[in-house]
Amino acid sequence: MDMNVKKKKLGLKEKYAHMTRGLDWQTSYQPMEKVFPQATFEGIKIHDWDKWEDPFRLTMDAYWKYQSEKEKKLYAIIDAFAQNNGHLNVSDARYINAIKLFLCGISPLEYAAHRGFARVGREFPGVGTRVACLMQSLDEIRHAQTQIHSLSNYNKFYNGFHNPTDMIQRVWYLSVPRSFFDDALSAGPFEFITSIGFSFEYVLTNLLFVPFVSGAAYNGDMGTMTFGFSAQSDEARHMTLGLECIKFMLEQDPANVPIVQRWIDKWTWRGYRVLTLVGMMMDYMLPKRVMSWKEAWEVYFEQNGGALFNDLARYGIRPPKWLDQISFDKDHISHQAWATFYQYAHASAFHTWLPNDEEMDWLSAKYPTTFDKYYRPRFTHWREMADKGERFYNNTLPMLCQVCQIPMVFTEPDDPSKICYRESDYEGEKYHTCSDGCKQIFDDEPEKYVQAWLPVHQIYQGNCFKPGTDPTVPGFDPLAAVLEYYNFGPGDNMDYVGSPDEANWLKWKGLAKEDPAKKAA
């Protein structure tokens, strides 16, 4: 009689090979270079795709089982947060403006990353890289969805949450993070992996998620904290994918080293410029602060990133360019950014305010060499104007950097009293950039950056009005027309003091008896 012999259970490596077998076939109807044309045009030389392996070896059956368990826990907490009026447990309604910025500026980028990884997963010939990109693509769309679901409860009670998908395409300050991803998505697959998988996910992700998630926890926002921690296990895989791809390219051919080095220089600088918004949030938008932007940069980039680049030195990779500029900027950029948003609060979908005396003392302690000298006098002057009923709004439009698209507000590395301007000439036209880093990036690829969609230029050209708008009619208000195009509603913009958000918060917390609409008016 035949005996049933129990089959040996496959190990993780064997199971991964079994589940992904057949994905790396050699084409016969068309040559491989026609099926994967993007794999060679950047100049990266790959001799053996089998040398790259996914260290997590995650298969689809394991992925869905693992993620479904996380989703159950996440949505249970989100439901409990909503049912128990969790929005009233945050430290102060000013904090809500930080997550308005997150929803409009970061969550759409998660969806853009989903699209990007789905695309490059098709463009890589190597099966291991394709499967890893597929998993990350799924992660990114899940992150976008869970962030929107977690923050949707706030949309019932606060202004400015209603239309992030239109805002990311139209609003002036959101062109900063959007241009970063537009730049990455219009690059080849290897540069995309370097920009998102390495520079952003590996080098800079802690500076994005740790301040937001820790800040949320410290300010009583359990919904934001929960989706942040839920995403952290995914981020570990994303960081590994980025680092493994970098090492894979460097190990395949020495000719890849200068190409990868240029990408690391470019995308570290571009990512750092995007994180200006995070620095502003850390220093000014959290009523209860976790750490300063300067401290976060020193811990998560200078120390952790320094160790990473020491490891990559054996491949011939040096630390990114312009670190001396960044070392100077870390004492300034958050203050310069907040001063800019304070002036343009009438054109922003979140509220701004001036730091009080206690908060300015905290900033003075964290930035002892710069805040009292350069920024406290400015804020004090604006407070005196506001006390007289002359709250300052800047009604002009600023020059924008052609690369990072941030207004030209940053100062020279050796002179904090002088605005940094750089110029480049291309085909008879002048283009302006905000720093040596952005100028070098422009000069390397001018044909790409001359096509940048700059919001200020578009406003002056009349492209930021709704169809049918006639700018020639008597009494035409261009700002009102632009805000209508942005789809801003009453109460989305202007100063926090006197806003419907402040009035409602005071009423809900029993701190004021006035009618919110009357008080806001």
Cite the ranges covered by each PLM segment.
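Intrinsically disordered, low-complexity terminal tails and linkers in eukaryotic proteins, enriched
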Residues: 357-358, 362-430, 447-521
